[in-house]
Amino acid sequence: MTAIKHALQRDIFTPNDERLLSIVNVCKAGKKKKNCFLCATVTTERPVQVKVVKVKKSDKGDFYKRQIAWALRDLAVVDAKDAIKENPEFDLHFEKIYKWVASSTAEKNAFISCIWKLNQRYLRKKIDFVNVSSQLLEESVPSGENQSVTGGDEEVVDEYQELNAREEQDIEIMMEGCEYAISNAEAFAEKLSRELQVLDGANIQSIMASEKQVNILMKLLDEALKEVDQIELKLSSYEEMLQSVKEQMDQISESNHLIHLSNTNNVKLLSEIEFLVNHMDLAKGHIKALQEGDLASSRGIEACTNAADALLQCMNVALRPGHDLLLAVKQQQQRFSDLRELFARRLASHLNNVFVQQGHDQSSTLAQHSVELTLPNHHPFHRDLLRYAKLMEWLKSTDYGKYEGLTKNYMDYLSRLYEREIKDFFEVAKIKMTGTTKESKKFATLPRKESAVKQETESLHGSSGKLTGSTSSLNKLSVQSSGNRRSQSSSLLDMGNMSASDLDVADRTKFDKIFEQVLSELEPLCLAEQDFISKFFKLQQHQSMPGTMAEAEDLDGGTLSRQHNCGTPLPVSSEKDMIRQMMIKIFRCIEPELNNLIALGDKIDSFNSLYMLVKMSHHVWTAQNVDPASFLSTTLGNVLVTVKRNFDKCISNQIRQMEEVKISKKSKVGILPFVAEFEEFAGLAESIFKNAERRGDLDKAYTKLIRGVFVNVEKVANESQKTPRDVVMMENFHHIFATLSRLKISCLEAEKKEAKQKYTDHLQSYVIYSLGQPLEKLNHFFEGVEARVAQGIREEEVSYQLAFNKQELRKVIKEYPGKEVKKGLDNLYKKVDKHLCEEENLLQVVWHSMQDEFIRQYKHFEGLIARCYPGSGVTMEFTIQDILDYCSSIAQSH
């Protein structure tokens, strides 16, 4: 085992700087091979690392190889299996349990003892030893007396050092000189003892020989100690001197620190003073401008604006911590507050005076516009006030209460001014629409006329926008048609209270121009005022959602102050609402006046609602493109609702007039008045609504009207006593079809086809009904023939029927010679001419259809004769050519 241990040390552990302390020959439990060893090793370098190494003998030779190594610190438990009986088995618990069987119990105990010592020395008893004999562990524990014995192995472990080359050489020389030592160890030991004694004696003699030198050395040491004492005394004196200097330097350093601190404080104090002086010192010129600056001149306004900005900067300066506790700062702030209050009062008072003066100046120009349909220009007023825009912005940020008061006063003054201007403007528009003059209203010598005009004006003003549609729109249209149609219409419908001369195209064109001029004057006026309010009062006017007019109409002078009692500026959304509310207050009379004007236009002619709908829609669309939330857009939108309501009412009135129409029992019906009026309405509407934005409304109205026309044409046709129903339907639907074909109204294509179909159907029905009269007996005879055939009698056997034999056929045919047929056709032509009206010019169309139908019946009769009476030689006493000649001569003779 010693030779194996030496070989393992040399071949495996020495190259790795390790020492082999213990070895045990083992095999795994359950296996018979014993060619592996467990080795306990330590490293020669510090820190010492203790390992358990498994070494296996190579199968191909006698050399060993290192298979696996575990650090001893990873060993948790050493299980010897049995502490009493000898047992070569033991377990080592690393990351898993390794079961071993030693070659002998002695080797196992020696290995476990070595592990115990290494555990005691390097691992501080970390490893648990289970089933290990206490005697084995006690032998390994060092005690006082036997420490040198029991701890020998440990000391050997600690003091073992490998011989260097020189030591190995000396030992080899000594061994060569003492070869007999191998055979005679006692002689060799004795020789070594003698040499040791010789060396000890030499050492003693050397020590005794150096005694004198030692004494000399001691004296030198004593002298050196004395010198050291002297040096220490000098150093002590130097130290005392340095201590004094140190105290003086500390005083100087402290003094310098205080001086530096004082300088720093002075610099900071100067900086604070400069900050306060630079940011809270208002120039005397600014103070003078705020106290007594001229607010009427441009130069004075500029000086006051600069002074107000400087004051605002001084008041809004961000003070540093502690500044607000300084008395001077408090006094300066109070002075600034007094200046701000003083200038705010001066500015508010001056602007109030400007508002009043401008209102008086503007009122003086009203007389110049009283006879013209134009609104006074407020641009000079706005231009003068915009010079104060920056001051208004300053007032808004510094004293919101006075800013709010100015806003209220401006609305009060301007609302009264605009109310006078707008009412006079609308009064002129009404006069121009009605054709009267303002002077005649005021100075008319005829009391009846003056009373009538006054009553009409009062009724319009008293309506407050409440509209009443005309009940005679159909009559008004009929007046514009031809004389014959006008006379028919006047005989059917109530003409209302408006004269026919007021309803011509020129009057409608004049109304259209006046209404357009009214809107064109109002639009720039409102936009200019809204733009001025935004700029002058510094309010944002864009990106606002339009509010309801019902909420805005309740605005009074105190609304704004009630909304912001805190005196703080409005947020952006509230500013947008404020612009809208100010515009509503200033122009509160626009919507009622527009409604009154619309009511007048509707009273003059209900068809004026078409013009108003198109014009108002266009202006609303334009205003919404500029700013959907503007007052103008909202107001015109509300008025547009009224106009649309009037338009719908106009359509409803026309339908109601259709339903109420009454026809004369003594004269023929002809073209119904509402059919002719629909034609003129459609023509007028197409010219008005060309490329208009509200085309959809007209299309809906067309649909309602045409349905009403269709229904009431049938109603009148059913009630007609003088004119046959088919004639009424045929003529009127022909007229409707011609109208729709000419106007090419895309939304009424289906109705156009329906009208054509109704016209065609009733034309055919009328022709068939009328043609049954001239050849009545012949018709009855052949109807009987067809009835027999329908009952199942063969056609060639009909002639054997008593009532329908050849003699009866000849008898009936003889009753209708050519002369009688021509006479009957002539009577038929006269009757048709009596039924049809001249306007539609359908006589020839109907006559030609009758001719075709007569020829068709003739051919039908000829066919029945050929089939039912073959070989009889019976024929009609007139031919198709005779029929053509009869019809042509009759048409030419009339």
Curated annotation (Swiss-Prot):
Major localization listed first in the record, in broad terms: other
Biased composition (Basic and acidic residues): 439-459
Residue span of region Disordered: 439-495
Highest taxon of the lineage: Eukaryota
Key words of the record: Antiviral defense, Cell membrane, Coiled coil, Cytoplasm, Exocytosis, Host-virus interaction, Membrane, Phosphoprotein, Protein transport, Transport
Gene3D superfamilies: 2.30.29.90
Positions of post-translational Phosphoserine modification: S470, S473, S487, S501
Compositional bias ranges of the Low complexity kind: 460-491
GO biological process, one term: exocytosis
Modification sites for Phosphothreonine: T471
GO cellular component term of the entry, any: perinuclear region of cytoplasm
Compartments where located: Midbody, Midbody ring; Cytoplasm; Cytoplasm, Perinuclear region; Cell membrane
Matches recorded under CDD domains: PH-EXOC1
Residue ranges the record marks as coiled coil: 152-174, 205-259
InterPro entries: Sec3-PIP2_bind, Sec3_C, Sec3_CC
UniProt record similarity statement: Belongs to the SEC3 family.
Subunit structure, interactors included: The exocyst complex is composed of EXOC1, EXOC2, EXOC3, EXOC4, EXOC5, EXOC6, EXOC7 and EXOC8. Interacts with EEF1A1. Interacts with SLC6A9; interaction increases the transporter capacity of SLC6A9 probably by promoting its insertion into the cell membrane. (Microbial infection) Interacts with West Nile virus and Dengue virus capsid protein C; this interaction results in EXOC1 degradation through the proteasome degradation pathway.
PANTHER family attached to this UniProt entry: EXOCYST COMPLEX COMPONENT 1, SEC3/SYNTAXIN-RELATED
Function: Component of the exocyst complex involved in the docking of exocytic vesicles with fusion sites on the plasma membrane. (Microbial infection) Has an antiviral effect against flaviviruses by affecting viral RNA transcription and translation through the sequestration of elongation factor 1-alpha (EEF1A1). This results in decreased viral RNA synthesis and decreased viral protein translation.
Name the UniProt record assigns to this protein: Exocyst complex component 1
Gene that specifies this protein: EXOC1
